[in-house]
Amino acid sequence: MQYTQLQTLTNYSFLKSASHPQELVEEAKILGYHALAITDECSLAGIVKAHVAAKELNLKLLVGSYFELTNGFKIIAIAPNRQAYAELSGFISLARRRASKGEYEAHLSDLRFRLQQCLIIWLPYFNNHISDVDVTTLATAFKQRLWIGVSHTLIAAEQRLFSHLNKLANALHVPLVASGLTYMHNKNCKPLLDILTAIRENTPIQQLGTRLHSNAEVNLKPLHELNQLYPEALIQQTQVIAQLCNFSLDELRYQYPKELVPSNTTPIAHLKKLVKEGEAKRWPQGTPEHAQKIIAMELGLIEEMQYEYYFLTVHDIVHFARSKNILCQGRGSAANSVVCYCLFITEIAPGQINVLFERFISKERNEPPDIDVDFEHQRREEVIQYIYQKYGRERAALAATVITYRSRSAIRDVGKAMGLEAGLVGQLAKSLAWWDRTGDLIKRMESFGLNPETQKTMQHFFALVQQILGFPRHLSQHVGGFIITQDKVSDLVPLENASMPDRTIIQWDKYDIEAMGLLKVDVLALGMLTALRKSLETVSQYDAAVYSLATIPREDPATYAMLSKGDSIGVFQVESRAQMSMLPRLRPKCFYDLVIEIAIVRPGPIQGDMVHPYLRRRDGIEEVHYQNDKIKSVLEPTLGIPIFQEQAIRLAMVAADFSGGEADQLRRAMASWGKNGSLLKFEDKFIQGMLNNGYPLDFAHRLFEQIKGFGGYGFPESHSASFALLCYASSWLKCHHPAAFYCALLNSQPMGFYSASQLIQDARRHKVVVLPVEVNASGYESHVVLTNHNTSAPPNIIQLGLHMIKGLSILTAERIVLAKGDKPFTTLKELSLRAQLSSADLQLLASADALHKLTGNRHNSRWQAAALMPHSPLLDGAELEEDALNTPAPSIEKNIQTDFNSTGLSLRLHPMALLRAQQPFNRCKKQSELASIHNGGFAQVAGLVTGRQRPGTAKGTLFLTLEDETGNINIVVWTSTQERCRQALLTAKLLLVKGRLETKDNVTHIIAGQMFDYSHMLSEFDIKSRDFH
């Protein structure tokens, strides 16, 4: 008996199925099915994952989708060929795009005119009141391509429905087919299916009634059960349909957009012309010979692989951005390409790193290249809309990201669906830290008096939470991956509306795109590019010599001296706790040191035990030894320690005689060596190749283990070098133009590790004067005060802008600035009338103390604002008089509290300065006093919790940053202490820490022994930390 399952929903019919696509494919293969149709509801979101699994298992896969039409029809459409697939994908796109996100609207007329080649299975059901006209329309429209689907799931009246369908089939001359009805791969998933139904319906499971599946018969069934459920003729019809279907996703062929090539030339000729033009700009004195050879090699491979259109497409996007003065820079493996450098896609010159094109493109890999380009985060939307305008919404769309269940969301949704007490569920979810794993949930449950081992309800709850983890919840948009095609995108993959206006996304994520070999252009957002442009614009107003990244002086000793002290708050890529600790140890002195600095504080080098040997060799403590000149040529820049991915590739090439493509395949195998055994087939070749070249066996094994240790996580040198350019630029600006630098960071928030308050604290430590928000002095953004600046030193005063005020709209702020013009406001009433402000606007300004120069103090501002009548056009131009109101100014404590609540910071006293005289803070050392404590001595400190980090490389160690009135205090919390002081760690705003002080390589931190939460003393302060995984 041969059987094809025709109605199968995966968990990409979000919250309607309890099985992953792979699970359904695997189960169908085990059960001996001839073929399986994946028919997610108005979606192809799960089809690629099913396709990959089916290919591995040699199971025939049918591509289809299930729809509920507006007239009540329930149908399945299956694509028998490539044209039918394009129709189906387009039909899904139409239905999705005419409805709001997550919904769809499909009409019978759409079906008739848009699915000319698809096979249709009509699924009549109980109480399905379909007009005879519609039935006749369906039967007439699809003639030999229509079946009536029958599903037997052992429910009441099923036999009566079957008799009715028999009569209907005879009357219409339409065959019946056993369509099956599958929402899970086996019956054990029924509890999960029920809980998913409750989540979808937003109703506790106890109240769902008939909305629940009445039994567990909606699974993939063994062939002998199917034989008992369906007449043989109905099962045979499944094979008729399967035999009509010859389409595979492997038939999809991506077509690059072609309009960028002039009609009188070829793609490669046009690309060569642009590269030649770029060469002249990059090397005005003539292209170096070695660069010419690399360019010729790259262009030859690009032509052979037919990637010309891809490079032209990315070049066009970058050219648009540069024409609009939008800073952008390519990164990642693309920086290994000299062609990309000549096209101004990347900024790393061949001389700055040892470029390796195989890391970017190789024949053996036979995959489209991947070029990631960062754009200013505040202006990236201009680039996105340019792409939409140039190619149209039919030919350009963003990739999807699948939002899946994580611990907290799983606990909340499962708990609510089970009808558990809402307060308990909320507390349990909040008690989980981001670093907790599934096993930690048991501990948290036990801390609330819940025992999953003895309490059946909790046992069920825990089991369901575990099962739902990783389940897809809904589609969201990718951070910037664009699919751009010559024809309609919907011929390849369905489109749907994103939650953001003027955005469309495809139904596949980046893994699906990679599996199908589609071109993706990553248009990414980077806050530092925004900050750099704004910094340079400010600097150019008083220093004409510095106006772009290219004009920043190179290899500046003062900049490297600043970094070597760990003074890197706000600096790109080296502002984390780990990087700030590494800087004084590595002490960078040149650009390449920054390339290493950025790459070495990563999981790969740390897990590969490469950091300490490198530092010892750098300090001259450990001798550098190379096996021979070939090894030296690869490892000399990093003192014999492999740090970069490119070095792993080169070592395989020079030591084990791998080709460039083979070496890159080795790197990719290393990236997934923990997930599959693909690395094993390379190990023998690597070891044998080294033995053949005369290397000792122990050295070969040691080298392979070393590069294996970082292969999955190590940074590409090209990527690190791209980031090092921005790191150096931001460092130089911080060192020489601190006011412009910090002002730009404030105007580019949110970005980076630090809040506006922390940045301002650091700015003041660098002798920058920061002025509070004030309606007559402030623009919308913060700005550097240039008035009367006539010294050789850069200006050092920042005036905070109206954008700092929480809740004040951009339009209101711009009205204030426009109304002020060259004539400052003299009274509150004048401000209200000229800027057409509402009472709410005035109260926001008063709360931020932005009116203090008009009213005297914050209390006066609030009273006067409250007393003002709403703006009336009748009063425009009227004489304005008002009685002065004089109330006592708020206390310093109240002012600081209100500052934080309205702007997130205070320029008055630091909150710790207010508390310093009180117990127990009067016994705490300030950050500025820690130098007086000997190494290993006891230390007691307190401060605002401004950051929590728990990197995966730190073996569970948590790093806290506390801020007091004199600076930042670094706290290290071992795992044993974390559990003991868990609640304080998770929620404290104000923390007191007792521990042991450690100082090494000019880095001081405190190993926490005890921690105490004193947040209640700042309960009215709106203070938040920035927490990073």
Curated annotation (Swiss-Prot):
E.C. number: 2.7.7.7
Q: Which GO terms describe its cellular component?
A: cytoplasm
Principal location class: cytoplasm
Q: Name one GO biological process term.
A: DNA replication
Q: Does the keyword Translocase apply?
A: no
- Cite the NCBIfam families for this sequence: polc (TIGR00594), PRK05672.1 (NF004225)
What does the record give as the reaction this protein catalyses? DNA(n) + a 2'-deoxyribonucleoside 5'-triphosphate = DNA(n+1) + diphosphate
Query: What functional role does this protein have?
Result: DNA polymerase involved in damage-induced mutagenesis and translesion synthesis (TLS). It is not the major replicative DNA polymerase.
InterPro entries, per the entry? DNA_pol3_alpha_NTPase_dom, DNA_pol3_finger, DnaE2, DnaE2/DnaE/PolC, DNAPol_HHH, NA-bd_OB_tRNA, PHP_dom, Pol/His_phosphatase_N
Do you know which SMART domains this protein is assigned to? POLIIIAc
Compartments, record wording: Cytoplasm
Q: What is this protein called?
A: Error-prone DNA polymerase
GO MF term set: 3'-5' exonuclease activity; DNA-directed DNA polymerase activity; nucleic acid binding
The record's section on HAMAP family has: DNApol_error_prone (MF_01902)
Keywords for this entry? Cytoplasm, DNA damage, DNA repair, DNA replication, DNA-directed DNA polymerase, Nucleotidyltransferase, Transferase
Per the similarity annotation, which family is this?
Belongs to the DNA polymerase type-C family. DnaE2 subfamily.
Gene3D superfamilies attached to this UniProt entry: 1.10.150.870, Metal-dependent hydrolases (3.20.20.140)
Entry keyword Nucleotidyltransferase = yes
Taxonomic classification, please? Bacteria, Pseudomonadati, Pseudomonadota, Gammaproteobacteria, Cellvibrionales
Q: Which Pfam families does the UniProt entry name for this protein?
A: DNA_pol3_alpha, DNA_pol3_finger, HHH_6, PHP, tRNA_anti-codon
